[in-house]
Amino acid sequence: MNGKFSKSASIIVFLLMILVLFGCSNQPSVTEDGRPILNGIMVKHALTKGFDEMEWLQEAEERAGVEIKWEEVSADWDQKKGAMLAGGDIPDIIVGANVITNADFAQFPGLFDDMTELIEEHAPNVQKMFDDRPEMRIIATQLDGQILGLPKYQRYWPETSTRQFINKTWLDELGLEIPTTWDELFDVLKAFKEEDANGNGNTNDEIPFDFSPVGTGGFGFFQPSVLLGSTGMTISGGGGQGYFVEDGEVKNFFIDERYKEVVSFLNELWKEGLINSEAFTQDYTKYQSTARGSGNEAKVGYTFGWELSDRFGTEVADQYVSIPPLKMTENSDIDVSWTYDYNQLNYGENMVQIASQSEHKEELMAFINELYDPVVSMQVLFGSIGPNIEENGDGTYSVLPPQDESMDPGTWKWTSTWADNGPLYIDDSLELELGEDMKSVGAQTEPLLPAFESVDPLRDVYPGLFIKYSQEDNNTLSLNNTDMMNLAMSNFSLWVTDGGIEQGWDSFVEQLKNMGLDENLEIMQGYYDDYINQLDE
C-alpha cells in the first residue's frame, strides 16, 4: 500500500513539474492588443531616466506594432558585452553609440542580421536617409556589402567642439586688447600672472592658461593641439593620433616641424609659469571646477571649452568671450585653421543592430524605421513633444527650457531621452528652434568660422568615420598606434614641462617611423584614395 501511494505521489509531483515548466515556457509573447513582446538592450547615459517614462518611445513602439522589454545599461557594458557575444545569446535589438563595433561584427560573424533587404522593404525613412545623404550608406556598409548597424546624423552641432575663451574683464582691467598672435598671447598671459588681473589683492592666485587633461592615447577636445591651426594645419577631433590630410596626402603631425613649433611655444609659456602647474596631473572634473572660480571671482585667464556657461558656470561666465584663431606672428601670411570636428559631433556609426536569430525582424525594422522619422528623431535627441519640445502648430518646433529650473539644458536633455546615444536622422527639412544652450554654442563658434572657409570637409579632413578597414589593416593600425602614442604623448608632456624638443626631435621621428608610422600612413592613404574615388564616381 505504501509503495503504491509513494508511486502515485511521484507521478503527481512529476505531472506538476511538467505543468510548471509548460507554464513557464508559455509566458505571454504578445500584448493584449496582439503586439509581439521583444527583448532589447540600450546602453544609455547614467543620467537618462527609465524608458517607460519616455512618451515618444512608447508611441514609436505602438506605431510599429511591437512592445520591447528594454534592459537599460549604463555601466560595465564591455564586460557584459564580451560574455554575451561569446555565448551567442543576444536580444532582438541592441541600441547605443557604437556599442557593437565593426570589430565585433568581424569577430562574431552571423550573430547580427544583414538589414539590406529589410530596409528596402520595410524602412522608407532609412532609405530616404541613404538617398539624401549617400555618406550615411557608406558609414553603414561593411566591406562585404552587408549593413549590420545603422548610423545617425544630428545636424545641429557646430563645426568644432573646441572654442577658445579669454577673460575680457581682466583684459579691460589691465588695459589690454584681445590677442591675435602667439606673441600677443604670451604678453597677455604674463600680465594676467603678474598684475593681479582679478583685482583681489593676491598676485599669485590667477591661472593665466589652462587646458583639458591630455591622455596617453592622443589628443582630444579642449587641448592645446588646436594651436596647430595657427600653422595652417587642419586637424580633426582635437588632433587624435596625429593624422590629418593636406593637399590630398595623409600625414601625421607628430613628425611635422609645425608640431615642434607649437610644443616649443608651449614650453616657453610653461617656463614663465603661465600654464596651470596642474595641467598634466588634474582630471577633467578639476579642470572644469577651477575655471568656475570662487563666487564672482574668476581664476583662469585663457582656456578652451564647449560653451561659456558650461565651462565657467553662471557666476563668472559673463567675464569671458570667444576669440578667433591666433596667427603665429603678426607678419604671417598663413591662412589659419582650427580643429574641424563636425563629423565626430554629428555623425555616429553602429547605433542599432538586429539579432540574426530574431523571429520578428520585420517588426523590428518597422520600429527602427520609426526612429528615423525626422519628428521622432528630434525627440530621440531632445526629448518628447510636450515636456521637452513645443509643437508650434505650423509644422515647426521649439526646444523648451528645462522644467527643472535648477538644471542646465544639457543635463536636462541627457536626463529626458536617449539623446546622442540614439539612432536618429535630423533631416534638413525639419524646422526646429534650438534651445538657448545650442544657440549660445553657435554664437560662440562664429569667431572661428572664417578659419573653415577654405576647408573642404569631404577632402581636407581624414574621413575616418566613413572608412571600413579590413580586419588585418585595423589590427596593424591599432598595434602601431598604441606603441606610437605611448611615446608621443609622454614626450609631449616632457617637452612642454622640461624642454628638449630640439635635441630629441630627430631621434623621436626615427623612433615613430620604426614603430610603424610609415606603414600606417601607407595603409590610410590607400583607404583615403579609395574614398575620394568613390566620391568622384
Regions found by a protein language model. Name each.
Residues G3, C24-E537:
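Extracytoplasmic/secretory soluble proteins
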Residues K4-Q27:
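Sec-dependent N-terminal signal peptides of Gram-positive bacterial secreted proteins and lipoproteins
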